């Protein structure tokens, strides 16, 4: 069972929607081959409200298979855009999002939240602090399904260290702005299987560690790594240097909203 904390940050995809004269739904996302995860959400929206068809274009800024929640962010962004275009209430959009993924409703609302159970129990919490991070990843990605499968296998073999941290304590540390406590609590059980599936993750961790972040952890099931810094200046300097070394790295800040109009 999960016990995790989620936070919205200023790493984003850009989504545009337009009406069609027919009933077709067309999604274009140059960065992703095959069916986009936002398509089922778009179909559910159309079925729920009996709308015309629409064209959707997604420009990825959130890397794929990084554990940064890009798929759920696209579901949320598409539903938000369609809701605006067809003037539908936020509650209805949240209901559709919940049918598409456990964290999709959170992505729609944004801010901070603790997720437990299988990820379906999401409890938002207020956090007045703004955190400065670097979101980085190696060139490869990690499949969430493969990471969880390997975790179960390694857990049975006793190869996963016991983790006593819990999301409630992480939430308290975030509210207080206690970076020392946060550093001690930010443990990801999927880190071991993720690094076994993609050893390059450890190299990105090492590079981030050279800039002395207050906190460093693998995001989700990887391959992305997040580092928390005391100041925006430190985060920006780290991101610039990693970019020079050919690593995807972005300086980001925590946000109180999940989706924004631009």
Regions found by a protein language model. Give the residues of each.
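Phosphate-handling active-site elements
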Residues: 47-57, 81-99, 231-244
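DPxDG-like acidic metal-binding loop motif
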Residues: 66-97, 106-110
